[in-house]
Design a protein with these regions (language model features):
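Short, surface-exposed loop or secondary-structure junction motifs
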Residues: 1-161
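Short loop/turn motifs at secondary-structure junctions and domain boundaries
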Residues: 165-168
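A short acidic/small-residue loop/turn micro-motif
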Residues: 190-193
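Surface-exposed amphipathic alpha-helical segments
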Residues: 200-218
């Protein structure tokens, strides 16, 4: 402990189980009632999309051709560990459209800045996670969130050092910049039809640079 910063799903998978034990309800229900619900996003940020929507291309784009399940996934979690757990886990499994993800990240920014109150997410708790500094020298990680790495970050060149964000394996990401008062969300299905496509690594920083350039925030 304290010697290296290692990205791992296991801690947040365990955290999801702890939340269920303490709250006395499933993580899916907890998300809907305690986090997304008060923001009006219970139908936009969710686990396990309703069956009737899974095959609607207007609702959920296909992702990868999964050898385990013998089909192209659509409206079904890509992460294998989350799938084994029924599609609900602390580290993976969320679905959302651009409006809902923007709404969630904008709410995080507003709560962080003290401009919005959430009944179950006090600013002090949120700031503890977003502003935490790793005890490991050279690590950019906060608690559950990444920060820009000089010269090599997916956030590009222009977001402030206090920015926080996270990437999704299927080709998604968000970044929240408290100094520029900006949130940037990218939703793609880069694993369709195969997870071998890694061009997203070049596209993400380019995308963020272009967004900030077009907004005049460079």
């Amino acid at each position: 402990p304290g010697t290296a910063a290692i990205y791992s799903d296991l801690g947040y998978l365990l955290l999801g189980l702890i939340i269920e034990r303490v709250a006395g309800v499933g993580l899916e229900e907890y998300l809907a009632e305690k986090i997304a619900g008060p923001l009006g996003l219970a139908e936009g940020i969710l686990y396990n999309p309703p069956g009737k929507l899974k095959k609607s291309r207007q609702a959920y784009f296909p992702t990868e051709n999964c050898p385990w399940r013998g089909k192209v996934l659509q409206g079904e979690v890509s992460d294998e560990n989350c799938w084994v757990l029924g599609g609900v886990a602390g580290h993976a499994g969320l679905f959302g459209n651009i409006e809902s993800v923007l709404g969630l990240t904008a709410a995080i920014l507003e709560i962080w800045q003290g401009r919005r109150v959430h009944p179950h997410l006090p600013r002090e708790v949120l700031a503890f996670f977003l502003e935490a500094r790793s005890q490991v020298d050279g690590s950019t990680w906060a608690l559950g969130f990444d920060r820009p790495t000089p010269g090599s970050s997916s956030s590009g060149r222009y977001l402030s050092p206090r920015s926080v964000g996270h990437l999704g394996f299927t080709g998604t990401s968000f970044w929240i910049d408290p100094d520029k008062e900006l949130v940037v969300v990218l939703l793609t299905n880069r694993v369709h039809p195969s997870r071998d496509n890694n061009l997203i690594r070049e596209f993400r920083p380019y995308f963020h640079d272009r967004v900030l350039e077009l907004l005049g925030l460079v």
